[in-house]
Every structure is written in C-alpha cells, then in structure tokens.
Amino acid sequence: MIPRYSRPEMVALWAPQTRFRIWFEIEAYACDAMAEIGIIPKESARAIWEKAGNVTFDVERIDEIERVTKHDVIAFLTHLAEFIGPDSRFVHQGMTSSDVLDTCLAVQLQRASDILIADVDALLAALKRRAYEYKLTPTIGRSHGIHAEPVTFGLKLALAHAEFARARARLVAAREEISTCAISGAVGTFANIDPRVEEHVAAKLGLKVEPISTQVIPRDRHAAFFGTLGVVASSIERLSIEIRHMQRTEVLEAEEFFSEGQKGSSAMPHKRNPVLTENLTGLARMVRSAVTPAMENVALWHERDISHSSVERMIAPDSTITLDFALARMAGVIDKLVVYPENMRKNLDRLGGLIHSQRVLLALTQKGASREDAYAWVQRNAMPVWRGGGDFLALLKADPDVSRTLTAAELGDLFDLGYHFKRVDVIFERVFGGA
C-alpha cells in the first residue's frame, strides 16, 4: 500500500524485519519443544536463542540468497544458519515451509485485528459523543432520497454507532477464527514432527492449534477474515455517502471540517468539497477488492497448491493497512464534523408540512374513515403543495371531507414536530445502554 494511505504501526507489522522475526520465533519455539521432548539437545535450543534471538536480519542478504534458491523460507533458514552455526541443523526439523508461513500469517492477522479493533473503538467513541450532542436536533429522514418524516441527527449517528458496534463484534470473531497454528509437516500428518511441538508453538504465540490441516491451514478461515474486512469497509462507505449527501450545496446540513489554508479546487476558490469521505468511499472499494480472491483461495488442489500465496502477499498487507487508515480517517471526520441545525430545520420546512401526511392519514382512520378514503383525501391536498402551491395544513382545513372528520385544532396538533421524537430515549437506551 502506498504511504499516502498508510499508518506506521500497521505498516511495521508487514515489514520484512517483522516477518523474519516471527519466522525465527516459530522456528525457535519449535526447537524448544523438541528439546523438551528429547528430539534435539537442550543446549542446542538455548544456543539458537542466544545466537539469533536479538539479531537484526539482513533483508538484502536474504533477498540475495533467494535469487539463487528461488525459495524464501530456504533463503531465510540459510541466513539464520550464518548466525547460529552447527546447531542450525536442528532448525526446521520435520517442518515444512507452510508451517512457518501460515503460522506467521496468523500472528500478523491477529495483531492486525487488534489494531483494527482499537480503530473501531476510537470511531465508536466519536460517534457516541456526537450522537448525544445532537440527540434531539431535528432533521429530515429520507427514503429513496426523498423527504419522508422527521428524525434527529443524533439518531443518524446512533445508527452508525450500532453498525460499527456490530463491525467490532465481527472483527473479534474474525480474529478468533484466524488465530490458528499449523505445524504438522508436509501434508498435515505429523509424520516427522510431534504434535506437542505444534501445541507449544501455538501457546507461545497466543494461537490455537488447527484441528486438522493439510500442508496449509484451510483457507475458509482467511476468506471469512477478509470478508469481515469487506463488510467493515462497506459500513465506512455507507457513513461516508451519508455525509457526502448532507454536504451537497442545496442540502448543507453537515460538512467536513475545512481547515485554515485548505483549498477545495485549483480553479474555483469558493469550493469546499467532501474530499475525505469521497476518499473513504474509494478506499472501501479497495478493501472489498480483496474479498473475491480470498474466497477463490479456498479451493486449493488436494493437500495444497501455491495459487493462494501471491494473492495473500498482496491482500493481507494492503487490506489491513487500508482499513486501518480508513477507520482512523472516519473517526477524524466524525470528531470534527461541522453540523448546521438551522439548515436541517430549513429543509424540514421545505415541503410545507407534507412530512406530517402519515399522522393525518392515521388520525382520519382512527376517526372512522376508511384507509382508502383517508389516503385519497390526504394525497389530493398533498400534491398541490408538492408542486409548490399552498400550505398543507391550510388545504387540509379547507377540505370538506377532512374538516368534517377532524377539527382544526386536531389537525394543528398533528403537525407537532416533537411527536416524532418521543421514542428517542428508548432508541438511545437500546444503542448505548445506560451510558
């Protein structure tokens, strides 16, 4: 992933030095277990840690060896032997490359999950704070992009909070599923390695053992992981699009913070564009682009082929780095979002009271009118107002069918905006609990 959409902690997780350090730990913990079982000398296991436990691996040297071997794990083991010496013969005993690669990937995805969960927590905190700030701020709810009935801006933010709370739960579940270790040998039968080695390495790295593997950990786990990232990205996009629509000039109910000295256009000095949320919409597409190849990786040949490898070398760092950046950016957008309650109220009033049509319909039916008649009476008064003529309440009061069913006072009461917000506390209690 390019630096523009990257943050240091997640980038460092995917750096070669980090990967080689995890590879070493897998090999060294395996040697510890083999020493305890009596397969290799205990002094050799200690020597491996003493001679290579704190070294900085020479990435260029490993690349140089790989140009000859055409095999990354062998290149690493060759370089490792340059530090360890004769005891290196006990490293990787009974193991296959995928034991190292898959277990390392599990560690990296587990750690990436921890970063992403922390990102979601920061976003949840921002959403909660702003939701309470605008808990009772009236705004128009839209269906199909068209004015429907009043909501509050706080409810919009509470909705996003509930969605990202689900995202957090999915990430926790994905972390759990991906956190598996497989050190079972060439085809998963433990023919040349004791299962206790796998158990020891898994415990040391905070993983579970894979119940049954082939040469690799089954890729349905990875498909579920990247699918989860795709869903989280889609939630980011949904919230981004909501903000982008609200920032449109003719709406302008909210907008991204526009900093001192910021420019919106090279040609038009007046422009204030929703560039952050537009950017987030694009980044969400990139995260989702990892989902299909991750699904296709599930169907490997027999006990394993290598078709998944090139895919994962790209999508694992790219999707986690991108989602980390996107979540942090979204938290910043919400934290600094500029809200215009006066424009929300202005937009609420644009349709001359039509947003109360359902209340009138229901009141008429409760007074004895059939639903079909009531709907026709309300609609015939609504359409002229929709076309820009007249006031809805005034037209209803003048309608003979409506006026003989409802008094003018009763009609007036139906246009009370506060009626729509009487359950806001209930909804907030459901979303946020007693907080």
Task: Name every feature range the model reports, one short phrase each.
Residues 1-184, 190, 194-200, 209, ...:
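A helix-coil-helix interface module used to build multimeric assemblies
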Residues 110-121, 128, 158-161, 165, ...:
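Short amphipathic alpha-helical segments with heptad-repeat character
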Residues 167, 215-308, 313:
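Glycine-rich anion/phosphate-binding loop at the beta-strand->alpha-helix junction
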